[in-house]
Amino acid sequence: MFRLRAHGKKPITITTTTTTTASTFLYWSPESSPTALSSPTNLDPNIWSNLPNHLLEHILSLLPFKTLLTLRSISRHLRSLILSPSFISDHSFSLPSFLLLSHPQSFNSFPLFNPNLISWCTLPLPRSLSLTCASSLLSSSNGLLCFSLSPSSVSSLSIFNPLTRSSRSIKLPCYPFPFELLSLVTSPKGYKIFTLCSSSSAASSRSVCLYDSGDRSWRKFGGVDQVLPRGFNQDGVFYNGSLYFARSEPFLIVSVDLNDGKWTTATGDGVFPADDEITFARLVSDPEKKILYMVGGIGSNGICRSIKIWEFKEETESWIEVETLPDIVCRKFTSVCYHNYEHVYCLWHKEMICVCCYNWPEILFFHVGRRTWHWVPKCPSLPEKWSCGFRWFSFVPSLSASV
């Protein structure tokens, strides 16, 4: 048995047992382990205090994940070891993924839905964010959340990893900084923040502002107004190094390269109904299989009669229809969004294409692998008076996502 103590904190005791399986090899508790299968053996603390890193890392790898999170607060050495890239890469942890719900009237926490367990839980926010930022969650990617600080003035952004409880404040390039369509894009090397910005003058042209965590600097590119009209409110989707946007009137796919800010325009060939029109078009991307999908409403005179899903075939640069929403489900969805398709947005989450509406607390999703449609039920903790402003995000906790 040995103890780990941080200055001013209660010690945590690690108790060894005579069993050797990974699940029962180590136990921990504030004083001693009540669940040990055999009597603990007192070990010389001088020996354990000089334990080599590779042995300590092996012992830590046998602990349950929740125990590891508790041990982070014991000392800086343990925290840096547990969060080190080598430890994370050598020891895989099975972490659940969630659909996160944000609402303007939620200030201290976010509801989380686990699709695998079909259950709800809560993600509390640290005090530094909870007072102002719950209503201003802007984007999420690979376990990182991006908030705007001081919503009334927006002078900086905050990148937050809820799992490691680490955060970084990013100063915006100027003040005031009116922006739109912000997207957080992560990679093994860090992350980038994309947004469109303009000056206070309504007649001024807009620019792409791109932040790179590698050199912690902003760059600016032009050419936005030629491809995206003012008032366009659908976030971009990351695919093959670029952010893609879909316009429905007229139907148009545009993309911007996140390295050089260059815009590309393509209509995209596809088998679309000749006598109908695309009433709305939304893009989602599978980051693991690198597949781009489009969810589109088909109808006439601005009224959606059916909802379809297309897959983009890069080798032929064409869209292939892969799924049609059942009529009875389509009628329910179009009724809850009141045929106001500007309220419709889509996101990708772990083999699921999620179709959401800002004024409806449920999610309609298509499981790509099973080819089945489902509804995510309303969160039981939501007040009945909340009738709009629902915004969903994919949240996949990650220890390796650095701020």
UniProtKB/Swiss-Prot annotation:
Question: Which sections of the protein are Kelch repeats?
Answer: 91-140, 192-240, 291-339, 343-393
Highest taxon above the source species: Eukaryota
Q: Which Gene3D superfamilies match?
A: 1.20.1280.50, Kelch-type beta propeller (2.120.10.80)
PROSITE patterns, per database record = FBOX
- Mind telling me which residue stretches traverse the membrane in this protein? none
Tell me which residues make up the F-box domain: 45-91
InterPro entries attached to this UniProt entry: F-box-assoc_interact_dom, F-box-like_dom_sf, F-box_dom, Gal_Oxase/kelch_b-propeller, Kelch-typ_b-propeller, KIB1-4_b-propeller, SCF_F-box_component
UniProtKB keywords: Kelch repeat, Repeat
PANTHER family linked to this entry: BNACNNG10540D PROTEIN, F-BOX DOMAIN-CONTAINING PROTEIN
Under which name does UniProt file this protein? F-box/kelch-repeat protein At5g43190
